[in-house]
């Protein structure tokens, strides 16, 4: 793709992207790109600079894989609201592999148990059941974490928690 500089003024390089359910304005590439890194940076800047997306704090990270010659777009949001899709892509964008058919995998809310009780997942945060001994505790799962079998976490209140309960 980048054996020679890509001059996007010669064709229509435009698209719309939906991030977490919000559709952008029409985004158009209008420069000459000597490397994939230049185009990756420009795509990320144009998408994250879009007024509609900025208005709802929706943003993406754009990456380029030299081995496959493809760009990837990852929402910075977490959980099941995290989605990325394209629409209104021009033929020139489709020739680069960015087309209306390109739909990302929807994110998932974290799931798990605390002290053997099913927690409530909201994005990357796992919360204990309301009123449980662990109430007030929250666990944040880092981006890219994946389960390799079962993970168990047990919780016990410390002396301060016990004293607080006695004072109430």
Features from the language model and the residues they span:
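Stable alpha-helical elements in mature extracytoplasmic
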Residues: 35, 39-43
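Polar, low-complexity export/assembly segments characteristic of proteins
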Residues: 1-36, 48-168
